[in-house]
UniProtKB/Swiss-Prot annotation:
Could be involved in insertion of integral membrane proteins into the membrane. NCBIfam families: membrane protein insertion efficiency factor YidD. Belongs to the UPF0161 family. Keywords: Cell inner membrane, Cell membrane, Membrane. This is Putative membrane protein insertion efficiency factor. It holds the Pfam family YidD. The lineage of its organism: Bacteria, Pseudomonadati, Pseudomonadota, Gammaproteobacteria, Alteromonadales.
Length: 84
């Protein structure tokens, strides 16, 4: 069952895709994580919505620097409201 996107999720995803297509190739591969920070941001926004997903993406981007080892860092699963 496909989940529908809000207009804000659609816009945020398109902006990140624009970065991936036009800016990232110029900068070259620098992300220390798997999935890359931009793919992580898209997945987080799709799963958690624009506000919470952007928060996860911002925290991830702040960790992406030469002093952090990087590695596999998937998007946290969405918590069920009944099981908090």
């Amino acid at each position: 069952m496909a989940q529908t996107q809000s207009p804000f999720q659609w816009l945020a995803t398109k902006l990140i895709r624009g970065y991936q297509i036009f800016i990232s190739p110029i900068l070259g591969p620098k992300c220390r994580f798997q999935p890359t920070c931009s793919h992580y941001a898209i997945e987080a926004i799709q799963l958690h919505g624009v506000i919470k997903g952007s928060w996860f993406a911002a925290k991830r981007i702040l960790k992406c620097h030469p002093l952090h080892p990087g590695g596999n860092d998937p998007v946290p699963p969405k918590k069920d409201r009944c099981n908090k």
